[in-house]
Amino acid sequence: MKYYLCKFVPPRADFLPTMSEKEQQWMKAHGAYLTELLDQGLIVAHGPVMDPAGGYGVSLFQIPDDQDIAALTSKDPIVLNGVGHYEHYPMLHLTSRQ
């Protein structure tokens, strides 16, 4: 297994409070996509971070060795629509509640 902390970086610091209607739709699809990966056991947890300098998203991934983290995050609807990007940080291990 491989483990990653993934940070979703929105296109602007004030993205969350200033989303257009289309961006709101894409964010809803983004949340549904991450929850689907959670249900598949590929994500351990995900959610928004309310940083005063600008909000962003964090996801903890636990994926099989033969899967590519960039391939998974590139299929996120918000990324497919050109709104923001992911940063991927490998972790040595991940311990979580069962």
Give the positions of each predicted feature.
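Conserved, structured core segments of small domains
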Residues: 1-98
